[in-house]
Protein backbone atom coordinates (compact mmCIF):
# COMPACT_ATOMS: atom_id res chain seq x y z
CA UNK A 1 0.00 0.00 0.00
CA UNK A 2 3.00 2.32 0.27
CA UNK A 3 3.16 2.55 -3.51
CA UNK A 4 -0.56 3.37 -3.63
CA UNK A 5 -0.02 6.18 -1.10
CA UNK A 6 2.86 7.65 -3.10
CA UNK A 7 1.01 7.51 -6.42
CA UNK A 8 -2.18 8.94 -4.91
CA UNK A 9 -0.49 11.86 -3.14
CA UNK A 10 1.23 12.86 -6.37
CA UNK A 11 -2.05 12.77 -8.31
CA UNK A 12 -4.28 14.30 -5.62
CA UNK A 13 -1.96 17.11 -4.49
CA UNK A 14 -2.93 16.17 -0.95
CA UNK A 15 -0.45 14.98 1.70
CA UNK A 16 -0.75 11.34 2.78
CA UNK A 17 0.26 9.60 5.98
CA UNK A 18 1.08 5.95 5.35
CA UNK A 19 2.23 3.86 8.27
CA UNK A 20 2.85 0.41 9.65
CA UNK A 21 1.73 -0.19 13.18
CA UNK A 22 1.81 -2.49 16.11
CA UNK A 23 3.89 -5.15 17.75
CA UNK A 24 3.05 -7.79 15.14
CA UNK A 25 4.37 -5.67 12.28
CA UNK A 26 7.64 -4.91 14.04
CA UNK A 27 8.29 -8.33 15.60
CA UNK A 28 7.04 -10.96 13.13
CA UNK A 29 9.11 -12.51 10.41
CA UNK A 30 7.21 -12.29 7.14
CA UNK A 31 8.06 -12.82 3.52
CA UNK A 32 7.86 -9.77 1.33
CA UNK A 33 7.65 -9.49 -2.41
CA UNK A 34 9.44 -6.47 -3.78
CA UNK A 35 7.88 -4.65 -6.72
CA UNK A 36 10.34 -4.33 -9.58
CA UNK A 37 11.29 -0.72 -10.33
CA UNK A 38 10.66 -1.28 -14.03
CA UNK A 39 7.08 -2.28 -13.20
CA UNK A 40 6.67 0.80 -11.02
CA UNK A 41 7.87 3.03 -13.86
CA UNK A 42 5.01 1.69 -15.99
CA UNK A 43 2.36 3.08 -13.65
CA UNK A 44 3.98 6.34 -12.48
CA UNK A 45 2.62 9.38 -14.32
CA UNK A 46 5.56 11.68 -15.09
CA UNK A 47 3.18 14.67 -15.28
CA UNK A 48 2.19 14.08 -11.65
CA UNK A 49 5.86 14.21 -10.63
CA UNK A 50 6.45 17.36 -12.68
CA UNK A 51 3.43 19.06 -11.08
CA UNK A 52 4.67 18.04 -7.63
CA UNK A 53 8.10 19.53 -8.32
CA UNK A 54 6.53 22.77 -9.60
CA UNK A 55 4.78 23.22 -6.25
CA UNK A 56 8.05 22.87 -4.29
CA UNK A 57 9.62 25.90 -2.67
CA UNK A 58 12.13 27.38 -5.07
CA UNK A 59 14.05 30.65 -4.76
CA UNK A 60 13.82 31.07 -8.55
CA UNK A 61 10.01 31.06 -8.32
CA UNK A 62 9.09 32.53 -4.91
CA UNK A 63 5.57 32.31 -3.56
CA UNK A 64 3.74 33.42 -0.44
CA UNK A 65 2.48 30.71 1.93
CA UNK A 66 1.05 30.77 5.43
CA UNK A 67 -0.03 34.39 5.71
CA UNK A 68 -1.89 35.66 8.78
CA UNK A 69 -5.61 35.91 8.03
CA UNK A 70 -8.83 36.68 9.79
CA UNK A 71 -11.14 33.70 10.39
CA UNK A 72 -13.50 34.54 7.52
CA UNK A 73 -10.72 34.58 4.91
CA UNK A 74 -8.99 31.54 6.44
CA UNK A 75 -12.26 29.59 6.23
CA UNK A 76 -12.67 30.50 2.55
CA UNK A 77 -9.17 29.19 1.88
CA UNK A 78 -9.89 25.92 3.68
CA UNK A 79 -13.14 25.51 1.75
CA UNK A 80 -11.36 26.14 -1.56
CA UNK A 81 -9.19 23.09 -0.88
CA UNK A 82 -12.15 20.74 -0.37
CA UNK A 83 -12.28 19.82 -4.06
CA UNK A 84 -8.88 18.16 -3.67
CA UNK A 85 -9.93 16.14 -0.62
CA UNK A 86 -13.27 15.18 -2.20
CA UNK A 87 -11.39 13.62 -5.12
CA UNK A 88 -9.04 11.52 -2.95
CA UNK A 89 -11.14 8.33 -2.54
CA UNK A 90 -11.61 7.97 -6.31
CA UNK A 91 -7.91 8.65 -6.94
CA UNK A 92 -6.85 6.09 -4.31
CA UNK A 93 -9.13 3.48 -5.90
CA UNK A 94 -7.60 4.25 -9.30
CA UNK A 95 -4.08 3.81 -7.92
CA UNK A 96 -5.07 0.58 -6.16
CA UNK A 97 -6.18 -0.79 -9.52
CA UNK A 98 -2.90 0.29 -11.15
CA UNK A 99 -0.87 -1.46 -8.44
CA UNK A 100 -3.07 -4.54 -8.77
CA UNK A 101 -2.29 -4.55 -12.49
CA UNK A 102 1.44 -5.00 -11.87
CA UNK A 103 1.35 -7.06 -8.64
CA UNK A 104 -1.92 -8.98 -8.63
CA UNK A 105 -2.58 -7.64 -5.09
CA UNK A 106 -6.19 -6.46 -4.89
CA UNK A 107 -7.07 -3.68 -2.48
CA UNK A 108 -10.17 -1.54 -2.03
CA UNK A 109 -10.91 1.40 0.22
CA UNK A 110 -12.70 -1.13 2.44
CA UNK A 111 -12.21 -4.90 2.16
CA UNK A 112 -14.84 -7.20 3.65
CA UNK A 113 -14.24 -10.78 4.73
CA UNK A 114 -16.81 -13.05 6.33
CA UNK A 115 -20.37 -14.28 6.11
CA UNK A 116 -22.52 -12.79 3.36
CA UNK A 117 -25.37 -12.58 5.88
CA UNK A 118 -23.31 -11.34 8.83
CA UNK A 119 -25.18 -10.10 11.86
CA UNK A 120 -22.06 -8.60 13.44
CA UNK A 121 -19.11 -6.95 11.69
CA UNK A 122 -15.84 -5.76 13.19
CA UNK A 123 -14.44 -2.63 11.56
CA UNK A 124 -10.65 -2.49 11.88
CA UNK A 125 -7.56 -0.99 10.37
CA UNK A 126 -3.93 -1.87 10.84
CA UNK A 127 -1.92 -4.95 11.61
CA UNK A 128 -4.57 -6.60 13.76
CA UNK A 129 -6.80 -7.19 10.74
CA UNK A 130 -5.08 -10.46 9.79
CA UNK A 131 -5.62 -11.96 13.25
CA UNK A 132 -9.26 -10.89 13.19
CA UNK A 133 -9.71 -12.43 9.73
CA UNK A 134 -8.44 -15.79 11.05
CA UNK A 135 -10.84 -15.53 13.99
CA UNK A 136 -13.75 -14.69 11.68
CA UNK A 137 -13.00 -17.75 9.52
CA UNK A 138 -13.07 -20.00 12.61
CA UNK A 139 -16.24 -18.43 13.97
CA UNK A 140 -18.05 -18.76 10.63
CA UNK A 141 -17.14 -22.47 10.52
CA UNK A 142 -18.77 -22.77 13.95
CA UNK A 143 -21.99 -21.25 12.59
CA UNK A 144 -21.63 -17.64 13.70
CA UNK A 145 -22.66 -14.96 11.21
CA UNK A 146 -19.77 -12.53 11.53
CA UNK A 147 -17.42 -10.55 9.33
CA UNK A 148 -14.60 -8.04 9.33
CA UNK A 149 -14.32 -4.83 7.34
CA UNK A 150 -10.72 -3.70 6.82
CA UNK A 151 -10.25 0.04 6.41
CA UNK A 152 -7.59 1.00 3.84
CA UNK A 153 -8.34 4.74 3.60
CA UNK A 154 -9.37 6.51 6.79
CA UNK A 155 -9.20 10.15 5.78
CA UNK A 156 -10.91 11.46 3.87
CA UNK A 157 -13.48 8.87 4.89
CA UNK A 158 -15.75 7.61 2.11
CA UNK A 159 -19.11 6.76 3.68
CA UNK A 160 -20.33 5.64 0.24
CA UNK A 161 -17.51 3.08 -0.13
CA UNK A 162 -17.96 1.99 3.50
CA UNK A 163 -21.66 1.19 3.09
CA UNK A 164 -21.05 -0.46 -0.29
CA UNK A 165 -18.48 -2.83 1.25
CA UNK A 166 -20.81 -4.07 4.00
CA UNK A 167 -22.68 -7.36 3.38
Model segments located where?
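Internal, well-ordered domain-core segments that constitute the primary functional module
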Residues: 1-22
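A generic local secondary-structure boundary/capping motif
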Residues: 4-8, 31, 112
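Conformationally flexible catalytic loops at phosphate/diphosphate-handling active centers
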Residues: 16-111
Amino acid sequence: LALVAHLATLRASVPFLHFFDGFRTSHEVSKIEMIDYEDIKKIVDVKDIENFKKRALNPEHPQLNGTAQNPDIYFQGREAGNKYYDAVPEIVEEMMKKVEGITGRKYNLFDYYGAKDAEKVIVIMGSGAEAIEETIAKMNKEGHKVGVLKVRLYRPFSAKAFVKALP
